[in-house]
Swiss-Prot record:
The active site is at D614. Capsid protein p27: Self-associates to form the irregular polyhedron core composed of hexamers and pentamers, that encapsulates the genomic RNA-nucleocapsid complex. Assembles as a tube in vitro. Binds to inositol hexakisphosphate (IP6), which allows the assembly of the polyhedral capsid. SMART domains: ZnF_C2HC. Residues 128-141, 1549-1561 have a biased composition (Basic and acidic residues). GO terms for cellular component: virion component. This is Gag-Pol polyprotein.
Length: 1603
């Protein structure tokens, strides 16, 4: 390896110069290639056949992993190898043409780079050029006296080596190879003496056209490739063969290439650049037709493969046409054999079909090259056809899309189109100019005309986009260059150019501010004649502050209330544009008074200075010349000021300085407190940190200065879904009071710089809510915008564990004020968060704004807040690795080993956050004692939760859910055991959040223990000097673990852990503890950054050695100490339990009785049978509500409890129960009903039990089959076949004929069973005893609401019909409500009377609480029909239709074709009711009113028998009414009247009662006189019925029966 590295390094230095890679980089590259299997040995690097695969693999690695170092090194090495090879090829060709031998192209190996070659001369004495010989000597090996050639024979005689024709003056052979790969003219011919065959013994090759001497190279086993791909995906397979440069030897390439290619095609697709690169690399060397076709079968589907075969044939026809025109074409073997044809190129000629060895021997090198090139071109065409790219003409840059992403999509689409390569670049540039965003289009139009390629355009746009406004470094540099001349000119004019004769600098005039004279000499000096003028400095009369000469006695005011520090945080660079244009008449120089508020003595408490105003600087800087020497200064975290003349060292005032600006009239502006910077500048400068507080304003050419609290480079762009079209939701109307509050809040946010005016095409509504304090809060409904966003992943998986803070370390808690409003929103995303401020009655155009900071309610705001704050704090974490800094959203907790270190770190954190633009609430800075953070109170040694109430209020399921969530938050700190959480978990069952819940006794008792635990329990802070211990134990309803210190002696818990809720039917305690130990170890590493030092296991593991396999797996890699001891006292609250490792169940028979169990869902029985002597003993258990699995489990449990102290064999045909019993071999936690049943039975046994599973209904003879059959027959025995038939039909819904045969019942009984099924009978029969209609007036009403559009706006009609008389009452309503239903019934009662019962559908207006109460007050029974089934309301539905037809006819008769006027609706509705109630309908001789007020008295008909549920016929009934499919019968003894289906009624011939009838037959008759369907013995009744029919007693359709 070292020799190869040395050779390659020498070649790189020769051909690459200064850019050559180092030996270390070359070695790393070679190691990677060998590791990836791309090189079998380092010497293979000299083979050109391996270059393209290496390039493809390293390119893919660079694209996927982003690691391009090895690719860069390989590019330099490849260039050197190619250059060396080109020189050697040229040299060998020159030797051949000059008759000096040659023809061999050797790889650039060590011998061809380092060994010089002797000069060779031509026999005639002509010398080859010295330069060529010397350069050729670098790469050519030393030649012997007789040069050897490989693969190149004599042109005249064909002799391979040593012929006398070598120096003949003949023309060189055509098609001499001179490129990346050598000439293939001699491939396939017999090797010479110098031929080398790598990886195998040398064997002679066959002559072209003769397959008999083919040596049989290493070829591709494509059958195995396809078999493995079909079974296991992409395998490691043999590869096709290529031609080595050493000669015509066929050797296999690296097998991983075909695996990588198949995987790439499957994942990336055919059009992927990675796929194309790998295919081109694989086919860079000639391939056999056998290998080409099989390769395409592997990577292409059936359809693409068919396309490829056609395309390949077309390409091969092109090659044949070219070979036909040119006899010396390489495919024809340069004229030394038969011409090529399609069969040869496809491998279908004689000796080639299915014979890769024959193809390798018979095909010429030129044919192989043509075959491979044609296959590659065909693959490119298939890729375009199989996976067409999207139309590039439809691609447009999105509003929030970056130019790079747009360029990626456009270039990919253009390159995948059918455009010719020469037209792609102009098309891409034209799309850049037309399809990009308007600002990008302007940049491109302004670009120089010399930019002619897409790459140049992209680079130009990206370079121009780097120029960002406000906070970019370019603005800082521009301000620096602009401020410095201004400062220097002013200071030079003031100081250097205005010195007196004595050399002292003269001050400015106090009156006019101009230099060159004193105040006393000022021509603008006021006349001091105003005795009422008072001095603001000395409080004297007769002069003002500018005329006052007292300097040290009483100058200025002391700091007092009302003074404030600068409101604007300061960034490291200016955040506003330079203000060069002044909007006021003030001069740029102002007079300032500085007062030191410190307590230490100084010579001068106050000084006057001149400062530069409106400079655009971020901070106030006092020149060291103006700063008193005895005023103390301190060093700062950032020791330099950037933007003021480049970089200037600075310090900061230790004391707070009071700064005031003196106005022209001598008055003093409101003083301001700040800590100014002190630097070596030639003039003091007032920055933004004090100008705003002084009431001054920065101005610029654009307008009002804009201040963002955090630099824009910290803004994180949002990710939008592909279809993020703008969302526009109109602003909701707001009352005037809320609109005023909204306007005030918007103005406030605008002044704070949180929003800006907008013209966005997005809009979502805003509103205000009143807070408890009475003020309003602004809210923005961003749900529609959030639906377009791609949510960010969680960057913080949970809250930090506070007990991990080192014990005794002092703490400090900081709170970031308005954290969201301190973080800017990316500029390209702001337009999506626009809103509208409306005006009342649209009196003025609406004002529109958009957020510049993170809006509250945006789904990504919390994540961005965490990321930005974490990015600001990251330098401090690196600078202070020992500082514990806990960051969760906008809360920070700092912990240091000392108070001084904590204070220093806290000040540095505060300064860093303030410089970044965040605001720290001073009143929320907490220091010990009594620090609270994330709902916990922290002391120097403990962490305790706060906020538990005495007793929560529980009313709904949602209340329980919130309470359980709070308890889950507290469990790691309090160690609440599972037994106390059980009562609350029980109340979580349900799906309706509003489902009622009660605060029951179990919950109350558990809550009392939790509250008591919260007053005594707390976590202890971790002591790094003591070992970290962990312990686990089983307890009631689960397991519990703890991380702490001194657990066995003086317990100090640091974190509690609990087992999860079981997810399987049964979980063994051993598995529960195993999972808890794994969880405990992971929590220790995650929380404390270290593994547990000591692990305490239950004492049962000490008795059971070696440890169980599950425990050993949980302890894998554990290097600490393991101790098995009794349960520590810290677990007493959890009530620990002993863990038994005893095996209770086995799958092998045990000596003891054998019992058989079975259960049946049809009989709802479970049975246990066992043999005692010649007879079988049976025990049964029945439960109609249990499932078959539960019945099986109960049967097995009953069998286990037959002999609790005796080993028992339980045989069952239930695989479910058998598998569960085997899993319950050891004690564990059940979670299903069946598991609880079995666990209860096993816990009562003391002997071993064996569970044996047999297949039911098997024909295998023997004891087990016999016993299982007995149990099965007993379980399925049915004493009541009719019940069995019902159960069978309920399960399978089979027809009556199959049901009759299966259950051995009559056909009539089977039909009845089917008809009672609501799923199989489309018109289900009503049960006997339910009266579908009244036998007389006012017995049963039917009511319904129907919609009549003609009656709009009160288009709902409430309709009630009396089921006996057919009388109708209708009322009109606007909506369907309970009040409307009650009003309608009151009207109907007033017209018809009070009914006994009313039948309706199950609409909410009829089933509401108020309607039920109304009906109860009136004493009316109420029933509902089948939901969604109109047949239960047949009479009222027909009445609805009849009423609507009558309304339509009456309306059209009055000329109202569509809508009826409201004034006419009441009259028309009354006319319709009159026509329906007071006139006969159909063939009836009585009107509904007559039937209602003069009803017919029903008489009893002939005696009948009815069939009851048992199938028997019951006597004692007389028929009253015979309807359509139903009959009303009356019991002669009890006078009970019921309706029964007509098929269940037959005459009772034992009774000869006469049928009497009064005036007329019942109106309930079905319209026919022969309503009695039986017997001649009732001829008198039939004659009477016939006479009634002649009198016209028929009924209308409304009176028909419901059936």
């Amino acid at each position: 390896m070292e020799a190869v590295i040395k050779v390659i390094s020498s070649a790189c230095k020769t051909y690459c110069g200064k850019t050559s890679p180092s030996k270390k980089e070359i070695g790393a590259m070679l190691s990677l290639l060998q590791k990836e299997g791309l090189l079998m040995s380092p010497s293979d690097l000299y083979s050109p056949g391996s270059w393209d695969p290496i390039t493809a693999a390293l390119s893919q690695r660079a694209m996927v992993l982003g690691k391009s170092g090895e690719l860069k090194t390989w590019g330099l090495v490849l260039g050197a190898l190619k250059a060396a090879r080109e020189e050697q090829v040229t040299s060998e060709q020159a030797k051949f043409w000059l008759g000096l031998g040659g023809g061999r192209v050797s790889p650039p190996g060590p011998e061809c780079i380092e060994k010089p070659a002797t000069e060779r001369r031509i026999d005639k004495g002509e010398e080859v050029g010295e330069t060529t010989v010397q350069r050729d000597a670098k790469m050519a090996p030393e030649e012997t006296a007789t040069p050897k050639t490989v693969g190149t024979s004599c042109y005249h005689c064909g002799t391979a080596i040593g012929c006398n024709c070598a120096t003949a003056s003949a023309p060189p052979p055509p098609y001499v190879g001179s490129g990346l790969y050598p000439s293939l003219a001699g491939v396939g011919e017999q090797q010479g003496q110098g031929g080398d065959t790598p990886r195998g013994a040398e064997q002679p090759r066959a002559e072209p056209g003769h397959a008999g001497l083919a040596p049989g190279p290493a070829l591709t086993d494509w059958a195995r490739i396809r078999e493995e791909l079909a079974s296991t995906g992409p395998p490691v397979v043999a590869m096709p063969v290529v031609i080595k440069t050493e000669g015509p030897a066929w050797t296999p390439l690296e097998p991983k290439l075909i695996t990588r290619l198949a995987d790439t095609v499957r994942t990336k697709g055919l059009r992927s650049p990675i796929t194309m690169a790998e295919v081109e690399a694989l086919m860079s060397s000639p391939l056999l037709p056998h290998d080409v076709t099989n390769l395409m079968r592997v990577i292409l589907g059936p359809a693409p493969y068919a396309l490829w075969m056609d395309a390949w044939g077309v390409q091969l026809q092109t090659v044949i046409a070219a070979a036909t025109r040119d006899p010396r074409h390489p495919a024809n073997g340069q004229g030394r054999g038969e011409r090529t044809n399609l069969d040869r190129l496809k491998g279908l000629a004689d000796g080639m079909v299915g014979n890769p060895q024959g193809q390798a021997a018979l095909l010429r090198p030129g044919e192989l090259v043509a075959i491979t090139a044609s296959a590659l071109q065909a693959f490119r065409e298939v890729a375009r056809l199989a996976e067409p790219a999207g139309p590039w003409a439809d691609i447009t840059q999105g509003p929030s899309e970056s130019f790079v992403d747009f360029a990626n999509r456009l270039i990919k689409a253009v390159e995948g189109s059918d455009l010719p390569p020469s037209a792609r670049a102009p098309v891409i540039i034209d799309c850049f100019r037309q399809k990009s965003q308007p600002d990008i289009q302007q940049l491109i139009r302004a670009a120089p005309s010399t930019l002619t390629t897409p790459g140049e355009i992209i680079k130009y746009v990206l370079d121009r986009q780097k120029i960002a406004p406000l906070t970019d470094q370019g603005i800082a540099a521009a301000m620096s260059s602009a401020i410095q001349p201004l400062v220097m000119a002013v200071v030079n004019r003031e100081r250097d150019g205005q010195t007196g004769s004595g050399g002292r600098a003269r001050r400015l005039c106090y009156t006019c501010g101009s230099p060159g004279h004193y105040q006393a000499q000022c021509p603008k000096k006021r006349k001091s004649g105003n005795s009422r003028e008072r001095c603001q400095l000395c409080d004297g009369m007769g002069h003002n502050a500018k005329q006052c000469r007292r300097r040290d006695s009483n100058q200025g005011q002391r700091p007092g209330r009302g003074l404030s520090s600068g409101p604007w945080p300061v960034s490291e660079q200016p955040a506003v544009s330079l203000a060069m244009t002044m909007e006021h008449k003030d001069r740029p120089l102002v007079r300032v008074i500085l007062t030191n508020t410190g307590s230490h003595p100084v010579k001068q408490r106050s000084v006057y200075i001149t400062a530069l105003l409106d400079s655009g600087a971020d901070i106030t800087i006092i020149s060291e010349e103006d700063w008193p020497t005895d005023w103390p200064v301190v060093d700062t975290a950032n020791p330099q000021i950037h933007g003021i003349g480049g970089g200037i060292p600075m310090r900061k005032s230790r004391d707070m300085i009071e700064l005031g600006v003196i106005n022209r009239d001598g008055s003093l502006e409101r003083p301001l407190l700040l800590f100014p910077a002190v630097a070596m500048v030639r003039g003091s400068i007032l920055g933004r940190d004090c100008l705003q507080g002084l009431g001054l304003r920065l101005t610029n050419l654009v307008g009002r200065a804009t201040v963002l609290t955090v630099a824009l480079h910290l803004a994180i762009p949002l990710k939008w879904k592909p279809d993020h079209t703008p969302v526009w939701i109109d602003q909701w109307p707001l009352p005037e009071g809320k609109l005023v509050a909204l306007t005030q809040l918007v103005e406030k946010e605008l002044q704070l710089g949180h929003i800006e005016p907008s013209l966005s095409c997005w809009n979502t509504p805003v509103f205000v809510i009143r807070k408890a304090s009475g003020s309003y809060r602004l809210l923005h409904d961003l749900r529609a915008v959030n639906a377009k966003l791609v949510p960010f992943g969680a960057v913080q998986q949970g809250a930090p564990v506070l007990s991990a803070l080192p014990r005794g370390w002092p703490l400090m808690v900081l709170d970031l004020k308005d954290c969201f409003f301190s973080i800017p929103l990316a500029e390209q995303d702001r337009e999506a968060f626009a809103f509208t401020l409306p005006s009342v009655n649209n009196q003025a155009p609406a004002r529109r704004f958009q957020w510049k900071v993170l809006p509250q309610g945006m789904t990504c705001s919390p994540t961005i807040c965490q990321l930005v704050v974490g990015q600001v704090l990251e330098p401090l974490r690196l600078k202070h690795p020992s500082l514990r800094m806990l960051h969760y959203m906008d809360d920070l907790l700092l912990a240091a080993s000392s108070h001084d270190g904590l204070e220093a770190a806290g000040e540095e954190v505060i300064n860093t956050l303030e410089r970044a633009g965040f605001t720290i609430s001073p009143d929320k800075i907490q220091r010990e004692p009594g620090v609270q953070y994330l709902g916990y109170k922290l002391g120097s040694t403990y962490v305790a939760p706060v906020g538990l109430v005495a007793e929560p209020r529980i009313a709904t399921l949602w209340d329980v859910q919130k309470l359980v969530g709070s308890l889950q938050w507290l469990r790691p700190a309090l160690g609440i055991p599972p037994r106390l959480m059980g009562p609350f978990y029980e109340q979580l069952r349900g799906s309706d959040p509003n489902e009622a819940r009660e605060w029951n006794l179990d919950m109350k008792m558990a809550w009392r223990e939790i509250v008591q635990l919260s007053t005594t329990a707390a976590l202890e802070r971790w002591d790094p000097a003591l070992p970290l211990e962990g312990a686990v134990v089983r307890c009631e309803q689960g397991a519990i673990g703890v991380l702490g210190q001194g657990l066995s002696t003086h317990p100090r818990p640091c974190l509690w852990l609990f087992s999860t809720q079981p997810t399987k039917a049964f979980t063994a305690w051993l598995e529960v503890l195993t999972l808890l130990i794994t969880k405990l170890r992971a929590s220790a590493v995650r929380t404390f950054g270290k593994e547990v030092d000591i692990l305490l296991l239950p004492a049962c593991f000490r008795e059971d050695l070696p440890l169980p396999e599950g425990i050993l797996l949980a302890l894998r890699g554990f290097a600490g100490k393991i101790r098995s001891s009794d349960t520590p006292s810290i677990f007493d609250i959890a009530r620990p339990l002993h863990v038994s490792l005893k095996v209770r169940v086995t799958d092998h028979p045990v000596p003891g009785p054998t019992v058989f169990t079975d259960a049946s869902s049809s009989t709802h029985k479970g049975v246990v049978v066992w043999r005692e002597g010649p007879r079988w003993e049976i025990k049964e258990i029945a439960d109609l509500g249990a499932s078959v699995q539960q019945l099986e489990a109960r049967a097995v449990a009953m069998a286990l409890l037959l002999w609790p102290t005796t080993p028992t064999n339980v045989v069952t045909d239930s695989a479910f129960v058998a598998k569960m019993l085997l899993k319950m071999g050891q004690e564990g936690v059940p979670s299903t009903a069946a598991a609880f049943i079995l666990e209860d039975a096993l816990s009562q046994r003391s002997a071993m039990a064996a569970v044996l599973h047999v297949r039911s209904h098997s024909e295998v003879p023997g004891f087990f089959t016999e016993g299982n059959d007995v149990a099965d027959s007993q379980a399925t025995f049915q004493a009541y076949p009719l019940r069995e038939a019902k159960d069978l039909h309920t399960t399978l819904h089979i027809g009556p004929r199959a049901l009759s045969k299966a259950c051995n019942i009559s056909m009539q009984q089977a039909r009845e069973v089917v008809q009672t099924c609501p799923h199989c009978n489309s018109a289900p029969a009503l049960e006997a005893g339910v009266n579908p209609r009244g036998l007389g007036p006012l017995q049963i009403w039917q009511t319904d609401f129907t919609l009549e559009p003609r009656m709009a706006p009160r288009s709902w009609l409430a309709v009630t019909v009396d089921t006996a008389s057919s009388a109708i009452v209708v009322t009109q309503h606007g909506r369907v409500t309970s009040v409307a239903a009650q009003h309608h019934w009151a009207t109907a009662i007033a017209v018809l009377g009070r009914p006994k019962a009313i039948k309706t559908d199950n609409g909410s207006c009829f089933t509401s609480k108020s309607t039920r109460e109304w009906l109860a007050r009136w004493g009316i029974a109420h029933t509902t029909g089948i939901p969604g089934n109109s047949q239960g309301q047949a009479m009222v539905e027909r009445a609805n239709r009849l009423l609507k037809d009558k309304i339509r006819v009456l309306a059209e008769g009055d000329g109202f074709m569509k809508r009826i006027p409201a004034s006419k609706q009441g009259e028309l509705l009354a006319k319709a009711m009159y026509a329906l109630n007071h006139f006969e309908r159909g063939e009836n001789t009585k009107t509904p009113v007559q039937k209602h007020w003069r009803p017919t008295v029903l008489t009893e008909g002939p005696p009948v028998k009815i069939r009851i549920e048992t199938g028997e016929w019951e006597k004692g009934w007389n028929v009253l009414v015979w309807g359509r499919g139903y009959a009303a019968v009356k019991n002669r003894d009890t006078d009970k009247v019921i309706w029964v289906p007509s098929r269940k009624v037959k005459p009772d011939i034992t009774q000869k009662d006469e049928v009497t009838k009064k005036d007329e037959a019942s109106p309930l008759f079905a319209g026919s006189s022969d309503w009695i369907p039986w017997g001649d013995e009732q001829e008198g009744l039939q004659e009477e019925a016939a006479s009634n029919k002649q009198e016209g007693p028929g009924e209308d359709t409304l009176a028909a029966n419901e059936s």
